[in-house]
Amino acid sequence: YLKEHNVEIEDYKNFSKNLKAFSEKDEEVLQISPQANEALYTLASQHTHVIIAPSPVALMKAHKNPTEIAGFRKAMERDGVAMVKFLRWLKDAVKVGEETELSVDEKLYEFRAEQENFKGISFDTIAGYKEHAAIVHYEATPETSIPLKPEGMLLLDSGAQYLDGTTDITRTIVLGPLTEEEKKDYTLVLKGHLQLQNAQFPAGTCGTQLDVLARIAMWK
């Protein structure tokens, strides 16, 4: 199908080399997304005329057809079932005191693997307990994984790939009693989430403009 429409797929590692070769064809015009980095623009513009404009491919991908939308909903429902089973398991398991960041990661994978059309995780799971939750994109390893206790909070950022959709869900799970500081911080973040969730704004408003709503409770 792709060959019939003159589409060629190249190895990603050859991207720079192929871009340079393409740009050296004087008769060619190259369109680059405004989000492209300076290195790509510089490489391409050395030999060819470059147009900076949103990618038509990205726009087509952003417009979902009814089949895709239905698939997303089914994937979300199945992933929701897996998450509910996991949370129920975690509530009992943490009381025993034998679970770690790595073991809950593995258990969540098991619950997802039970679901129809499961193909794998959509990214490496972030299971951060207590201070580890503050590490951006933390990933537990056998060397860093710490045991869970029936206290404090567990940050769980995870997702799955299903044949008909991809999921990404983040939850902050209270495992037991919290300190007063933890309660305050949790409540302030929740207020920010609700402010952003319920915001009404005109078309054309940027995410950076709305970001203040998520932070204003903490600033006060």
Residue ranges and their predicted role:
Residues 1-220:
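Active-site neighborhoods and metal-handling regions in enzymes and metal-associated proteins
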